[in-house]
Design a protein with these regions (language model features):
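Active-site nucleophile elbow and catalytic-triad environment of alpha/beta-hydrolase enzymes
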Residues: 182-199
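Acidic catalytic loop of the alpha/beta-hydrolase fold
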Residues: 213-218, 243
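Conserved alpha/beta-hydrolase "nucleophile elbow" surrounding the catalytic nucleophile
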Residues: 111-113
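Active-site loop/oxyanion-hole signature of alpha/beta-hydrolase fold enzymes
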Residues: 63-107, 255
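Short beta-strand/loop motif that positions the catalytic acidic residue
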Residues: 202-203, 209-211
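Catalytic active-site module of serine/aspartate enzymes centered on a nucleophile-bearing elbow/loop
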Residues: 239-266
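Flexible "cap/lid" loop of the alpha/beta hydrolase fold
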Residues: 117-125, 130-161
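Conserved HGGG/HGGXW glycine-rich cap/lid loop of the alpha/beta-hydrolase fold
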Residues: 23-74
Length: 266
């Protein structure tokens, strides 16, 4: 496992720095899995899960912090309502180019929360580049529980100590990370945000959709929507699990991901 690096990135006339880390890079003949973090996530917040998964799958891995997170360049402007669509179509391809990922390499995407939505959107926009997607706790539309969870997170961040302190261990600019995500989702009108039409009839690879039954940010309706939109979807509801299955039930996540990965290699 290589050490994290800071990679320069040119995006829309701006020069940014992207924090990234390669896993098992020496396994050049094996497929590459891209890890896409949650809305308050970063490279370091994955902990050891990506390496464990890559070892189980015998694949290479690439983790990075999106701009606004971790040690990547802080956010300069508010996220627009369609920020995930923009990231899927422009930012993620630019990051992959900057990090030396060949455009003809078919990728396996593992996304959590915002990152799961991003993985689905990228797979829909560039189906020729994706061999399979794991969408863990994805967002396809906004539910009342989503808004309530965001409000509670804001209360905890502004009036408590533990959440701010926890995030400060992983983000160079904690306010940039928190408010970029929280402000966008709580902005008036965002409750109408929906990516179902972006995905409809555009996904071409197998999808594993995982959701904790106790997820405070979304219900099983999120992954059920994926199955309605795309026939080649395996649904997995995890009893007793919240919004972070990779931390709460990592063995189950790895087991289900192995099954999908084997299908994608067949």
């Amino acid at each position: 496992m290589s050490a994290p690096i800071l990679q320069p990135l040119q995006l829309q006339g701006q020069t940014l720095q992207i924090e990234a880390q390669w896993l098992r890079a020496e396994r050049v003949a094996r497929p590459l899995t891209i890890f896409l973090h949650e809305g308050l996530g970063s490279l370091s917040q994955w902990r050891d899960f990506p390496l464990r998964l890559c070892e189980a799958l015998d694949c290479r891995g690439l983790i990075y912090s999106r701009p606004g997170y971790g040690n990547s360049s802080p956010r300069r402007d508010p996220w627009p309502q369609d920020y995930l669509q923009r990231q899927a179509k422009a930012q993620l391809p630019a990051c992959l180019d900057a990090l030396g990922v060949a455009r003809d390499e078919r990728l396996f995407l593992f996304g959590h929360s915002d990152g799961a939505s991003l993985a689905l959107l990228f797979a829909a926009a560039f189906p020729e580049r994706v061999r399979g997607v794991v969408a863990m706790a994805p967002h396809l539309f906004v539910e009342p529980c989503t808004i309530e969870g965001l409000r509670q997170a804001r209360q905890a961040y502004e009036h408590g100590r533990s959440l701010r302190a926890a995030l400060a261990r992983h983000h160079a600019d904690t306010d940039s990370a928190f408010y970029g995500w929280n402000d966008a989702w709580l902005r008036p009108g965002f409750e109408r945000w929906n990516i179902e039409d972006d995905l409809r009839a555009r996904l071409a690879c197998p999808v594993l959709a995982l959701q904790g039954e106790e997820d405070e940010y979304g219900s099983l309706a999120q992954i059920e929507a994926i199955a309605r939109l795309h026939a080649d979807t395996v649904l997995c509801a995890l009893p007793g699990c919240g919004h972070a299955p990779q931390r709460e039930q990592p063995e189950m996540v790895i087991e289900h991901t192995q099954a999908l990965f084997q299908r994608c290699q067949a």
